[in-house]
Regions:
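Conserved ABC transporter NBD signature motif
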Residues: 60-70, 74-75
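Conserved ABC ATPase "signature" region
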Residues: 99, 103, 110-128
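Conserved catalytic motifs of ABC-family nucleotide-binding domains
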Residues: 153
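Catalytic Walker B motif of ABC-type/P-loop ATPase nucleotide-binding domains
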Residues: 157-160
């Protein structure tokens, strides 16, 4: 059963009277992955530094696994952190490196080695445990960093730009690993990133920051739906025979859910924008459009739905454009 492991309550941080973070509040459940998104200066880094006890908030508080931010010494054993820059030593092996950190958390040498190897196996690095770190690729180094962050069995794992610098396959593999860690171990994860696609692919929840404030939060689909109400553009691409393009245009313009129709006269390819409504379901609208076209005996050669991506939502929400 999922339960709340992190509660942030009106976290605020100011420098010389200028707020860098304004009343950040959210909850995170065990086994879920949350993405922090926002442009430079949005407050993401400040939020992470507060939640990992590097900074003290000007006001507000947070609780991790029942321990409040007033007691940072007890918070730290409950969290794991993968910083953007690792700074790994090159002249020792991965097993020696992880075993050292296991000993720092109170394990005896033999037990620390066993636990370290088990953690390396968890991140797919068991076979490379005996190699010197200087021989590791960038992806291996990131996995080693994740192993270090997991060595104390944290309740919440914080990752800053975890897939930066990886090739596309390496990114997908690492994101899959993070999802597995959350699902199989029940670890809550906060992923701070500028890479919108990785957040969309890996996260259950998204928190969008702009100028220190939360401008949107919820599941990925919730944030997309919120932005979708405000973003204009092409929703559908419909291909009909050129000979039927004028009839298709007239049919589409008569449908109340459609805001505009463009193109089609030359090549039969129509671009359709839907009218915006807070409760609009695009699936029902597309079914209505298809039924109407086919009912008017207009052949449909192609039908493509263009859903908003997180990139669109991010730009719309952080720039604050109105509909």
């Amino acid at each position: 059963m999922s339960y709340v492991v992190l509660v942030a309550d009106r976290l605020t941080k100011s420098y010389d009277g200028q707020p860098a973070l304004r009343e950040l509040s959210f909850e995170l459940q065990a086994g879920r992955v949350m993405g922090f998104l926002g442009p430079n200066g949005a407050g993401k880094t400040t939020a992470i530094r507060i939640l990992t006890t590097i900074l003290r908030p000007t006001s507000g508080r947070f609780v991790i696994d029942g321990v409040g931010s007033e007691d940072p010494a007890r918070v730290r054993p409950r969290i794991g952190v993968l910083p953007e820059t690792l700074g790994l030593p090159n002249q020792i092996t991965g097993a020696e490196y992880i075993g050292y950190f296991a000993q720092l958390y109170g394990r005896r040498r033999a037990d620390a080695r066993r636990h370290g190897l088990a953690t390396l196996e968890l991140v797919g690095m068991r076979e490379r445990a005996g190699r010197l770190i200087r021989t590791y690729s960038h992806g291996m180094r990131q996995r080693l960093g994740i192993a270090r962050a997991l060595i104390n069995d944290p309740v919440v794992l914080f990752l800053d730009e975890p897939v930066a610098g990886l090739d596309p396959r390496g990114q997908l593999d690492l994101l899959a690993l993070l999802r597995d860690i959350a699902k199989d171990r029940g670890t809550a994860i906060i992923l701070c990133s500028h890479g919108l696609s990785e957040v969309e692919d890996a996260c259950d929840d998204v928190l969008v920051l702009s100028e220190g404030r939360v401008v949107a939060s919820g599941s990925v689909s919730d944030v997309l739906a919120l932005a979708r109400q405000r973003v204009s553009g092409t929703d559908l691409r419909i291909h009909v025979p050129t000979s039927a393009a004028e009839r298709a245009n007239a049919t589409l313009r008569a449908i109340p859910a459609i805001e505009s129709v463009r193109g089609g006269i030359v090549d039969g390819r129509l671009e359709v924008s839907l009218a915006r409504g807070p409760d609009q379901a695009i699936e029902g609208t597309t079914n209505e459009i298809l039924d109407q076209l086919l009912g008017d005996e207009i052949p449909v050669l192609g039908f493509e739905v263009e859903g908003s991506r997180l990139q669109d939502a991010f730009i719309e929400l952080t720039e604050g454009r109105s509909s």
